[in-house]
From Swiss-Prot:
Name assigned to this protein: Photosystem II 10 kDa polypeptide, chloroplastic
InterPro entries linked to this entry: PSII_PsbR (IPR006814)
Transit peptide start-stop: 1-42
Family: Belongs to the psbR family.
Residues annotated as signal peptide: none
Keywords: Chloroplast, Membrane, Phosphoprotein, Photosynthesis, Photosystem II, Plastid, Thylakoid, Transit peptide
PANTHER family xref list: PHOTOSYSTEM II 10 KDA POLYPEPTIDE, CHLOROPLASTIC
GO biological process: photosynthesis
Function: Associated with the oxygen-evolving complex of photosystem II.
The UniProt record lists the keyword Membrane: yes
Domain of life: Eukaryota
Major localization listed first in the record, in broad terms: plastid
Length: 141
């Protein structure tokens, strides 16, 4: 009973909302001095050198002059940056390079040595897997 009398005499007052800037030692500050202190500057256009640019240059063969989405072609295709960057778009990461692929596809360009390396690698992976299975089984006990 005395506790209920004591609680009824206590009144709660709303406290004002204040924001204090707290800084902890050893932690970096997340505030910046001024928003214009950070600036990104490009170093300029760097042209790559290729003997011959990869990819198609100049035009695209579109059926009825319309691409798959129904838009009319503009005549320069995807690969239009040979003058600006020194190579076509595909020159940076060519999908097909004649120096790496066989002309007919009948012969592996790596030769017998490449096939031997491939076979040894595959055999090593399979033998390693078999060894792991054996070591974790009851047969190894």
């Amino acid at each position: 009973m005395a506790a209920s009398v004591m609680l009824s005499s206590v009144t709660l007052k709303p406290a004002g909302f204040t924001v204090e800037k707290m800084s902890a030692r050893g932690l970096p500050s997340l505030t910046r001095a001024s928003p214009s202190s950070f600036r990104i500057v490009a170093s300029g256009v760097k042209k790559i050198k290729t003997d011959k640019p990869f990819g198609v240059n100049g035009s695209m063969d579109l059926r009825d002059g319309v691409d798959a989405s129904g838009r009319k072609g503009k005549g320069y295709g995807v690969y239009k940056f040979v003058d600006k960057y020194g190579a076509n778009v595909d020159g940076y990461s060519p999908i097909y390079n004649e120096d790496e692929w066989s002309a007919s596809g009948d012969v592996y360009k790596g030769g017998v040595t490449g096939l031997a390396i491939w076979a040894v690698t595959l055999a090593g992976i399979l033998a390693g897997g078999a060894l792991l299975v054996y070591n974790t089984s009851a047969l190894a006990q």
